Each structure stands twice: as structure tokens, then as C-alpha cells.
Amino acid sequence: MLPFEAIRRSVEVSTVRGQLKVGVSYDEFIRIIKLLVSLVEVDEAWYMRQYEDVALAIREGIFASPRAHFASNGYLEGRMPFPILVDEQWYLEQNPDVAESIRRGEVLSAQEHFNQNGYREGRLPFPP
């Protein structure tokens, strides 16, 4: 785990109207995110099956592993590191547009929507 102190040194802390505020450059923000994401467990076999372009890039030596791709690019591209099970009822309650898409036959399920678009769009798969 990345030590808190390592992150704290990377940001500017100030007080605004009695509240602590944290400021960071975009480049530093991305660096911190990549460090944190590098700690995520990646289901490497699933990742290679799910993302054929990544499998090709690994075979060509562009990336060392699925985990390396996820940490450097995949997370920022909105790729999932492993299969994530969706709470169908909750997801549809939170996302009426998805329920409507299912009704119209555009997607088969909340799970399919989440896998294809929802994760990348920042939708939650189950209650926080």
C-alpha cells in the first residue's frame, strides 16, 4: 500500500474558510492514481480474453503483463481489472435509462450494460 506520507508530500494543503483543501496538478493527480491502481489485483487470464488488443500488445512486447497494462493505461481507459457482478435490481433503479434500453431491446441486462458501458461511464454496479 502506498504510504499516506508519500501522497501527502505530493499535494498542496491549504485552509480555505476554516476547511483544509488539497490541491494537486493534473499530472501529479494521474501519477498518484497510477500508483494506487498498480496495487489492484488483475485477473490476468480474464483481462486478456476481455481485451484482445491488450493480449496482442503483450504478445508484441509493448506491455509486460495485463497488470502492467491496467496500471499504466487500462484504468484510465475505463477497463475493468476483473469481472464485477452487478446488483441488477439496484442498478436498474439507479439507472432508469438502462432499464429503458433493456425494454427497447438495446441491451439484454444491467450486467451487459455495465460491462459494455457502465463501468467506463463511472456507474456503480451495486450500492456503495
What are these regions (language model features)?
Residues M1-P128:
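Charge-rich, low-complexity intrinsically disordered regions
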